[in-house]
Amino acid sequence: MSIDGYLARDDHRLDWLIGTEGEEDTRYEEFYASVDTLIMGRNTYEQVLKLSPDEFPYEDKTCYIVSRTLQDSHTGTHIVREDVLSFIKNLKNEKGQHIWIVGGGELLQALLKEKLVDELYLQIAPVMIGKGIPLFPPTEQESRFSLQQVNQYKQIAEMHFVLKEDH
């Protein structure tokens, strides 16, 4: 995300990330290997398809798309239309590795409100874009996390947080 908390420009473009020194050096492969399930909203899903039109980049994982309006999805993905919070609560109780919420916005906010997010991995690029799609939309919800680790990959900072149990 940008220093000022945005995932993308208003039109979902990520051009501001291009050329950020270190973006290719993060431990993404290690993180990705620790995940067996991905969940994303329709907007994130459509952006993934635009960025990778020839091959869906998450074919080796179980992938759920949260949308009430999406009619069709890529082979191997599953559309979740109703009662997303109950679906995710049940999913968290299944055996497996980590669940990755790809993107952010409204879906992430709803999950935070219900305390369904255990950890946050935030990567911050040294760019301010001024406006765009925020990772965390405004809310009345307060959540407390404990900082576990900070890594630097050239110009990218990564912070790992764990939700505090007592809050």
Locations of the language-model features?
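Enzymes that bind and transform nitrogen-containing heteroaromatic metabolites
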Residues: 1-167
